[in-house]
């Protein structure tokens, strides 16, 4: 859902992040995750930044793993568990205050044109 984030504060960046499993949300997001994983493989996407985000959640900060094709995997920073995945629009990527080269912008635009950012589950 768009516009439901009341708080999104960029805390900083991580050099490394260890993934430690999944939350119960994984089942609810299996279709979107499948498409995102396919995009990462088919487009040869690489991690370009790992951002720490404070959304004011009781379980703590999130680690947003941003790929150079606009896919963002979101984990709990403390537990390392997967929460969700975004096939992001350009404004969502720009919130991370990272350089968005033309090739990345084009991939994001292509995903949006195909409606991939609208996949609910």
Predicted regions and their residues:
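Ribonuclease/tRNase effector modules and their secretory precursors
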Residues: 1-121
């Amino acid at each position: 859902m768009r516009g439901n984030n009341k708080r999104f504060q960029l805390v900083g960046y991580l050099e490394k992040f260890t993934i430690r499993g999944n939350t119960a949300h994984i089942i609810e997001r299996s279709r979107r995750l499948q498409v995102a994983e396919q995009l990462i493989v088919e487009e040869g996407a690489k991690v370009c930044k790992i951002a720490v985000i404070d959304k004011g959640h009781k379980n703590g900060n999130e680690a947003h793993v941003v790929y150079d094709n606009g896919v963002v995997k979101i984990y709990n920073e403390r537990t390392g568990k997967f929460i969700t995945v975004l096939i992001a629009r350009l404004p969502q990527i720009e919130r991370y205050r990272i350089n968005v080269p033309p090739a990345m912008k084009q991939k994001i635009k292509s995903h949006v044109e195909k409606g991939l950012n609208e996949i609910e589950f």
